[in-house]
Amino acid sequence: MRTVFFGTAEIACPVLRTLSEMPEVNLLGVVSQPDRPKGRKLVLQPTPIKALAARLSLPCHQPPNIRRCEATLGWLEALDLDVIVVMAYGQLLASSVLEMPRRGCVNVHTSLLPKYRGAAPIQWAIWNGDAQSGVSLMQMDEGMDTGPIIATQSIPIEATTTAALLHDHLGELG
C-alpha cells in the first residue's frame, strides 16, 4: 500500500516506526512541521518525526503551510498514494490533500473520539478525572477530528497516572 505519513511530535514516532516495519506498507515519505528553535540558545532542532525519517532513510517535506506549498502538493500528487496516515501533525489538511489517496486519509488521535477533539486531549482526560482514555483511528474529513471513527482502543487511567505517563502509553497504543 503506497503510503505517506504526516506527523511532527514525539508521540507519533511509534506509529511511523510501526508503518516502516509493515511488509504490506510501501512507506514513500513523511511530511512534518518545519524545524523550530529550541532551548536557551534557540538552536534549530529537527522535529522528532523528521529525525526518525532520516534514520529510516525516508524523504521528509516540511512545508510551513501544507495548503499553499506547491512543491509538497506536487510531490504527494505524483506518488499516486493509496493512503495518508496522520498523527500529531499540527495542521488541518485541505480537501485537495484529503482526496489524493485512493483510500483516503486516516488520523490516529489520542482520545476516545468524539470526546476531546483537537489539541491537548491527554491533558483534558487527566484534568477531568476520566476513568479511561484511548486512541481512535478515524477517516479524515475537513473538520478537526470530525470524520467517521474506524476503531478505538481504550486503557484505564489510574489515580496515579500522570499526563506524561498517559502520553507514553497512548503513543505506543497508536
Predicted features along the sequence, with ranges:
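One-carbon transfer enzymes
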Residues: 1-174
